[in-house]
Amino acid sequence: MKKLKSALVKCMGPLYNVLFKTRIENRRLIKEMKQLTAEKEYLNYQVNYLKHHFDIGQMKPATGVLREYQLAEVEFARYILDLLKPYEIPMYLEGGALLGAKRHKGFIPWDDDIDIAMSRADFNKLLHVFKTDSNFVWIDTTQKSGYYAEYYDKLIRANANKNVVIMTPTCVHVFNGTCLRDSKNLEFFPNDFLKEEVTEEQYLAFRDKAIAFIRVPHTWKELFDFYEATWKECGLFSLEPTSRIVPGLGNWDLTEYGYHGFRHHDDVYPTTTILFEGKKLPCPNKAEAILDREYSKSWRDYPKDIGFPLTLDDKNKYFEMIGEPLINYKEF
């Protein structure tokens, strides 16, 4: 019996040592976790304290590379809009650009693009201008292949320092630069007038079916053909003004944003102008009403994505993929 007990102790000794060390390590990890939790709560309190006492509209503009990019973007936007001025196409700031104009008198400090929207009839007119005006280089994107950022990069390089128009399934880009890295970009989006007799239920049923088709992988040509055929066949939309406006087929908002109700014609038209980084840009008639509907009253408060410029992040994903240096837009 003594020999058996001795053998068991001898065999179990290493296991006891492991268990003892594990217990000590677990205690250390628990202590560290408590410290990290306390630090997180402390930082959360500090952030919430600043948010409570600091008006986001008074936030300083971006600095460094991001600020340089923003100012180049607004100069480019004004340049393109001046080229389009003779065509008298009513258009207006959309999305984050409109929010930035109202809340910051320019860019949201961490934003990096400018979105412009217009009615379907005006969007069709804009496409005709892009195809026929010698100030622009229209690209046939129906045969697009490959990763979208690589595709943009190739087309910009092939048309260096020209206003390259690239129609995608979610917007129309106008790029200018020598490559994607140094290019400026302005984006245009179509909105549609909804016929007066169409009910909200009918529109939402159409919207769900359209989104279901769009989110399944398709070639760009298949999507363009779907937009054209569906717009004509559904019978929901009007080229003439009506009292209600919705994101159009070919508008990023249709698939990526939730439904927030209809926009009212009088909230959008007649369009006006607003100061954006010291430049006059086109604006909806009642910008705050538009923003209240799109974002609720929370557009005046702090969002969840603070600090991250999405366009530059997208570019960096491409540069990482091809082994090029990333754009360091961080300010500190």
Q: How would you name each of these model-derived features?
A:
Residues M1-Q46, H53:
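Boundary detector for helix-to-coil junctions that initiate low-complexity/charged tails
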Residues E25-Y49, A97-K102, D112, P190-I211:
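Short N-terminal signal/transit or membrane-insertion segments
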Residues K34-E94:
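Helical scaffold of the NTase/Pol beta-like nucleotidyltransferase catalytic core
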Residues Y49-F54, G96-A101, T242-S243, Y259-H264:
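Short hydrophobic/aromatic-rich motifs at helix boundaries and adjacent loops
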Residues F54-D55, Y92, W110, T170-H173, ...:
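Tryptophan-centered motif/residue detector
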Residues A62-K85, L127-Y295, R300-F332:
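Conserved catalytic core of two-metal-ion nucleotidyltransferases
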Residues L81-I114, M118:
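Active-site nucleotide-donor binding segment shared across nucleotidyl transfer reactions
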Residues R120-F123:
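Helix N-cap motif at beta-to-alpha junctions
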